[in-house]
């Protein structure tokens, strides 16, 4: 890890574990560690970023030298607009090379990056940019999605009418004539014109190690989104070097591919993991199953991906196209696969392990969160694999599983996931909201970080995440996680996805409600509902007989494909579903509301 000035103290907890400071006195920058370190080495001329559009004929490759030159030009252009240290800069961009250029350009000048999901509508953009008081936004006219231009600039324009802090908008022309792009004089700047003539070589800002680098929002169960603050030393010290290198064996020779969005944590992983180690990154615009259902596997094949990341929901969706689709492609370049974002059910885990890992490749399950900037549990090359399990605790974080009083629970018992030690990746409070930070993580069990996940360790020492702890279902005094029942439902082969929630019951305390997405070709009728209900009874016992089985075409999901059980539960109970800005498919909420209104 590179510093301009070495730190004088590794860890300072004099104000309490909640306010731990790392690498005190040290100065550094994410760009120093991810790009500048490779100058003058053989890595500098090697490919860093490989991009493919929805049309596979649209491809672009940038070496580290070429990529860094673009970063410097954009960084200099931003400085020419008066943007500098501590200013917040929004990124409202899809999966393009320029998105990653922007990521590093903002950090290079010491500004604070605010990634925004490229599928956001105006309201979530307004909420985030206003909370962070953004000075500038980097955006694009639009992006291709399933062969159709998706307009982004006009969405941003609508939002900025209610964001007075934004003084500058830098606009990339990607769609060209396919998208009209009105420009506001004095505020909007054409990207290409702005960077033309700028220097391709400029110094990187020397920042305090714990200075804010990234302001990334995550949804709360209630209220506005929570602004998590990553520092220049934090994300690299946790997710990149500790989790993905020491635990998950990322190497300089690897080509990384994890199809997501810069608006989520995986976007920063894609930017920083390969660049820190001198590896390469594959970026793909669009969706994994267009222009054909084998696109995702073809990308792995054509670009010789060695390190593949997936979300369980992605695999559930690709499974529907049949085994023969994935088997058409040569995936022999793969060395390691990893997954994150949500709990696995057994059927898709086994499908992926058989058809992609060929029952021999490491399949490393990782889980953490935006708030911790890294992993709480991880897979490694040295621990056994079991469907949906994690081999080890995150290093050094004091990960434990406890009961309501904070006492550790035994093997086979379900408890609350907590972290007892300060973690270099922890959010540096929540953006300008210390009280909410303490309430959210530290006051349930004083002096212990309560993460909000429901976890278990089995008799062999493997760990499992069983859903959010606010998803916990307690039926007749028995506590269970939703994924246990969801595994039974998807195991019937009749449904591709399921969300299980607990709802109040006068006798049992909670009753089970199952919301399921039938597989293509399976009739969504009363017979299916009865079959699914019986599957739960057979697997869990009669006390878990569902009160209701609802059949829908889709479940509410975030962009990184987490199923939002809290939203399903709130809609079912007639409560406000809270912040929905991270949903990729709000129409799923409307469908569920419609079915419940009948």
State what each model feature region is.
Residues 45, 49-104, 121-126, 186-196, ...:
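Conserved AMP-binding/adenylate-forming core of the ANL superfamily
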Residues 108-193, 311:
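Structural core segment of the AMP-binding/adenylate-forming
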Residues 236-255, 265-306, 321:
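Conserved AMP-binding/adenylation subdomain of ANL enzymes
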